[in-house]
Amino acid sequence: MPREDRATWKSNYFLKIIQLLDDYPKCFIVGADNVGSKQMQQIRMSLRGKAVVLMGKNTMMRKAIRGHLENNPALEKLLPHIRGNVGFVFTKEDLTEIRDMLLANKVPAAARAGAIAPCEVTVPAQNTGLGPEKTSFFQALGITTKISRGTIEILSDVQLIKTGDKVGASEATLLNMLNISPFSFGLVIQQVFDNGSIYNPEVLDITEETLHSRFLEGVRNVASVCLQIGYPTVASVPHSIINGYKRVLALSVETDYTFPLAEKVKAFLADPSAFVAAAPVAAATTAAPAAAAAPAKVEAKEESEESDEDMGFGLFD
């Protein structure tokens, strides 16, 4: 089958990306640095039926999107984020589920000299199994060691590489000697596009519990501020009413002014013994049903004992 010419290929690519943008309301913009063709094929297979991966040149993706802005102006939000080695993952499924599937397809990778470290690398304290002749190599990297049973032992955990640092030749050699593959590569989500809105992928980690706690915290802050400045809101009005009632009650106690709810408080303040007497009455009211049930249990127990005694006498008659 003859290979299609470049003009036809471009035309088909434009049609494909536009169709995907129309058919799928959600997509990820993903970085594909250090992702090989074999790993990309594995990612496509794992997402089959749930998502579609589309890679391409940035200029072609931007051109296709700009040509479709008249029909879907919200796509303009994607343009500033199409830079570097990026692509799209289109889906109709739950975004968190697809994100987890992408993370599951990351593969461990050895450190290469000159590569930019995507994460911090720490060498744990361990017996390396290397001979004493390598001691100077560890000293050059500032790693404290000792010779234990003829092999080099690292005495404490060592932060070898920081995030964003360029991996040096010595660091890469050491990690390879220790059989440590510190990095993992795969499609990295850079932005999320969801029904016209674009946001950071960290938003996917927000749960309902987080939203609920943040909402309550906001309500408490609003109520506190409104109470201080005397500005009534839905959040502060209940507290304002309670505080107002307390002030009126205090004023009533100190003056001759009274109202039904204040009379009981005044009576207790005038005769504290009445308040003390009221407590046992309430307790007695609560205990009455239990007390009424107790004699019935005692009576039942006595009947049971009498029955047992009768049975005992019957055995020896």
Curated annotation (Swiss-Prot):
The modification Phosphotyrosine is found at Y24. The keyword Phosphoprotein applies. There is a cross-link at K297 (Glycyl lysine isopeptide (Lys-Gly) (interchain with G-Cter in SUMO1)). InterPro entries: Ribosomal_protein_uL10, Ribosomal_uL10, Ribosomal_uL10-like_insert, Ribosomal_uL10-like_insert_sf, Ribosomal_uL10-like_sf, uL10_eukaryotes. Residues 294-317 are annotated as: Disordered. One of its GO terms (molecular function) is large ribosomal subunit rRNA binding. Keywords: Cytoplasm, Isopeptide bond, Nucleus, Phosphoprotein, Ribonucleoprotein, Ribosomal protein, Ubl conjugation. The modification Phosphothreonine is found at T59. It is found in: Nucleus; Cytoplasm. There is a cross-link at K264 (Glycyl lysine isopeptide (Lys-Gly) (interchain with G-Cter in ubiquitin)). Belongs to the universal ribosomal protein uL10 family. This is Large ribosomal subunit protein uL10. It comes from Homo sapiens. The lineage of its organism: Eukaryota, Metazoa, Chordata, Craniata, Vertebrata.
